[in-house]
Structure formats: structure tokens, C-alpha cells
Amino acid sequence: MDIEIVTIGDELLLGFTIDTNAAHLAREFAALGVRIVRRATCGDDAESIAAAVREALDRTGAVITTGGLGPTADDMTKPAIASIFGRGMVMDAEVLANLEQRWLTRFGHTLPVSNRQQAMVPEGCTILANRHGSAPGIWLEDDHGRWVVMLPGVPREMRGMLADTILPLLRDRVPKDGPVIRSRTLRTANIAESALADRLGELARGVNGMPLAFLPGNDGVDLRLTSWSLPSRDAEGALTQAAALLREKVGRFIYGEGDDDLAALMLSECAMRDLTLAVAESCTGGMLGERLTAIPGSSRTVQGGVIAYANEVKTRELGVPAEMIAAHGAVSEPVARAMAEGVRQRFGTGIGIGITGIAGPDGGTPEKPVGTVWVAVDVEGDVRAVRALLPGNRFEIRYRAAQLALDRLRRAFAREAGDDAVGWTSRG
């Protein structure tokens, strides 16, 4: 089944609000085996809404809209779409009664006149109950089987109605043994998109007939495999086989799948090894500590940290010799190592991590340009350091430096099994 999505609202069109509805719909429909072939956004204008929905119906015969079902003058979705089907608008007594009861129960007063508009619906439509808000959804279908579902634009309401009503209805219309859309995401760190493509070779074009998408972000590059044409019973097995082929090529850079978070994975690994951890941060300014402590239960592993931004703090709080900083500079391998060793000894932990770098936009030199970062990891006295040149703005460099530190901890653990690979960011 093919469907098009039309999201409605001036706030979306002008960029004041991020359209999270379309992304959520696409993910949920893909899991159901429904293919989204096009997404469109239009403003709160009746002609634009009618044109966008009419064109979508002509292509697929099935459209989901979000937005424009509220009580104000700019909520034009229902009459605009009713006009496409040649339907008039009528007051639905049951919807009106529900609205009146809702206002009396929740707010203790009668329904405002403006909200009566929400009880106006296209003739011959099916009302879709909305237990998450005031605006009901609408299902409108013609004699040729073409249909439009209108959902509220408020994300919480839209998601609730999708789960309560729309997905069960569509599930009955999707062939039980037909092809489904399934995907598998492998998460990588410390390697660039181009370097991944080079290592994958022909697999970068697709694996066993499945397309492979490269999705770069601050966490690293995600590799997403998608099966479009297999029944549900075969898709997962095919994805597992394809993922195994990718792991053969770039497995040392893969730290997880799906929504796996590297910070959470490292905390779990530390707990399994009965190791505690402390961090010493300069350019990241506490970002690594924040990522770790944002995870429930992190207090069992994370003992503390030091934000050693000034050189004097590096010396006073972490024991980094002032003469070392003078000789090598604050952004150097010896200083990063001393920070990791110093914070581990200060907090009495099994692991110490030190990060020092130049996040920019100022402070770079030809020898140490903006983005230069040194990360050191001390695991029970075994200290290893890596230099990286990270791209991006100040926030991106700081975030990627924290991610690099987590990945170096992962590699420190993996070296026990012989994995001593260094990613693309290494510079010396």
C-alpha cells in the first residue's frame, strides 16, 4: 500500500515549528508495510490544502493529513478537503455533545462559541474519536475507494490517535503475506562517511539487493539497511544476513544497533567489569560527564569529574605538572595522559578519562588547528591516548570529542580481545 502525507500549518511552512508528525507517521507506516511515496507541507490556506490533497489522491488514492482541525479561523482542513469530494459541511450532534461535556468536566464552563467549529464535519465522513484532545479525526472516502484521513496537528494527539485508531484500521487493509518495510541500523563511531564507503567497497551500493543509507551525525555515521520487498517472515532474516556482511568489513567501528547509545553501553560495560569511572574535561566543559550522568543508574559507576579549563586548575586539581604544560602545551598527548591519570587517582576509580582540545572558533594555530583534540583513557594504569582533528562548529567539536572519548573506552576494552584499530580521526 502506498500513502502520501500532507502536513498543514503556516508554522511548519515558515520553519517556526519542526515537522515531527511526518517523520513519526513514516516510521510507523514502514513497520506496518505501508510505503510513504511523498510528503508535502502547505500553509493554512484552503486552496493550497485542496490542491496538495487532490494531487496526492490522484497519485496514490490514499492520504494522511495532520493539522488544521482546531477552532480558529485559520483551521481550514476539513472544508478544503470536503470540497474535493463534493461534500458539504454539517454539524455533528454527537461530536458537539462530547465537546460540551469535555468543557464542562475539564474546565467547569460551557463550550466557547469558537470551539463549536470542531463539531463541523464533512457529510458522509467517519468520525475518529480523539481521547487525547478536543479535535476528532476524520476519515473521508469516495465511491472509488480513494480516502483521506485527517488528524490533529498537535503531536501528542496525533500519535495517540495513530496508535488507537489509524494503525489498526490500516492493518486490516494491508495484505497479511505481502511485502513489508523493515530496516536495521548499525551505529559506527570514529570513522568518516567516505572512509566507511571505501572499506565497504561494493557493499556501499547495497547488500543482497537491499539499499544501504549512510546517515552521518554527531554520534558518528549510522548505516541503515532497508528491506522493501520481502514478507515479514523473511525480512528479518535477510537483514541479519546483510548486517553480518557489513560487520565483516567494518565491525571494529560498529558499537551498536538501532537506538543504542554509546554512553549507556559503556556504563553497562563498566558495571559488568566492576569498574568505576571519573572524567577530566577541558574543551568539552562537562559534556562527557553530562552524557554519562543523564543515564539512570550511572551513580553506581561515575564517581565524579573535574572541569579543568584553566591550566592552573589542571595543575592544582589533577596534578598535571606546570612545566609539562609549558613544554608541550595544554592540548598535547602528555597533558591528556596526565589528566586521565590524575583524575583516576584523585577519585580512586578504575578508569580515568582526560580530554583536552581546541573547540574554536578561535585559538587554533597551523600546528594545532581548531578541532584538534587529545583524548586519553586510563584503565587501571594502562593509559592510551589518541589525537583527533574533528570537524564542525564549537558545539559539534565538543560533542564529537565526548563521543570520541567514549569510543576510546570501548576500544580499550576491545583491545583485550586484540582489537587495536584506530579510526579516521587519528592524527599521530
Curated annotation (Swiss-Prot):
SMART domains the record matches: MoCF_biosynth
Organism superkingdom: Bacteria
CDD domains per UniProt: cinA
Stored Pfam families: CinA, CinA_KH, MoCF_biosynth
InterPro entries tied to this protein: CinA, CinA-like_C, CinA_C, CinA_KH, Competence-induced_CinA, MoaB/Mog-like_dom_sf, MoaB/Mog_dom
HAMAP family named among the record's database cross-references: CinA_B
Family: Belongs to the CinA family.
Name under which the protein is recorded: CinA-like protein
Organismal lineage: Bacteria, Pseudomonadati, Gemmatimonadota, Gemmatimonadia, Gemmatimonadales
